[in-house]
Amino acid sequence: MSQQKNDDFVDDINQISNVSVSKKESESTLSKVDNNGTHALNDINRRTGRNMPQAIATAAVLVVAIVACLLISIDVFVVLMAAFMVLALWELHVDFATLGLRIPFVTLSLCSLVTIFATYYSKWHAVVMASGITASLFLTVICATLSITIPARTLHAVEKKLQGSSSTKYEHTLFTNTAVSLFVVLYIPLLASCIVLALTNTRYAVAHAMLLVFLPALSDTGGLFAGAWLGKHKLSPRISPKKSVEGLVGSMLFAIIGAYAIIAGFYGSYWLNCWWMPLIMGIASGIVGTFGDLCASMLKRDIGIKDMGHLLKGHGGVLDRVDSILLCGPVLLVLLHLANF
């Protein structure tokens, strides 16, 4: 009887030991899985140059917001686009201020909003758009000049009195601020107005909006992942070291697939009459979108910043997200009219 109790006690000890060993082995396995997962995530972040969990979460929120606006009304989408445009103007205003350059943000914002909504709601869309951009350029020059002239004249007078000589800082400041302000008008309000112009087709406005927004976005996505994992031949290492020829090909492929999917979904069999147009749209979106990213990289390099802003986690600023959309807008607008979509 005593021997049996001892044997039972030994068996219990062995079972406890086995459970302890199994628990340690499972914890070790989980630790290895966690380490492997962390290593894989770090590798993805390193290759893409982004915090991918944040980038994916932000992209999902943006997609839901855009689709929700389109489902409600195209008017709501135009309001959302106008809000993004003002945020992009603010980012440029802040970024240029780091270089000592001043742009008339309030004037630019008001002129841009009036131009966009007047273009969308007016019967003569293109005429109103051209008039609005012309007025914006004129008012921007005046406001940029006035915002610089008064303080610059004061500085000029003080320097002349203290040093006994004139200064060229006044002329240089006036010219550069006016030139930068004009660049901003042509970069954001003009290109955004081209996108609005494509939305005036009331029958296919939603399809146009999806093409104008999602083709450049798909181009960016394809270029990001193709360049990160397949990129070997640098496209322009001095401007953007991560851009590659393989990334450009990936941009075009993703945009082509997106163009066929959107057009087939909205236009049915009609797209078969011009099956080549989605192909051209995808190729154009890939090329122009990549060119837009390179232009934005040049601008950021000159300013001395990595991102235009920090509003969109994982992406940078609003302008970092919409730069390719802005440049693709006029090109896709022309192609939509050529295809009679």
Where do the language-model regions lie?
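Interfacial loop-to-transmembrane junctions
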Residues: 302-324
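Transmembrane alpha-helical segments of integral membrane proteins
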Residues: 264, 291-307
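Short, conserved aromatic-histidine micro-motifs
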Residues: 271-276, 315-317, 322, 341
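Re-entrant/interfacial helical elements at transmembrane boundaries that shape
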Residues: 228-229, 298-304, 326, 330-331
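Juxtamembrane boundary at the C-terminal end of a transmembrane helix
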Residues: 334-341
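Membrane-embedded alpha-helical bundles of polytopic integral membrane proteins
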Residues: 2-283
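Short helix-coil transition sites and intra-membrane helix breaks within transmembrane domains
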Residues: 215-218, 288-292
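Alpha-helical transmembrane segments that form the membrane-embedded catalytic/substrate-binding core
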Residues: 58, 223-224, 243-255, 289-292, ...
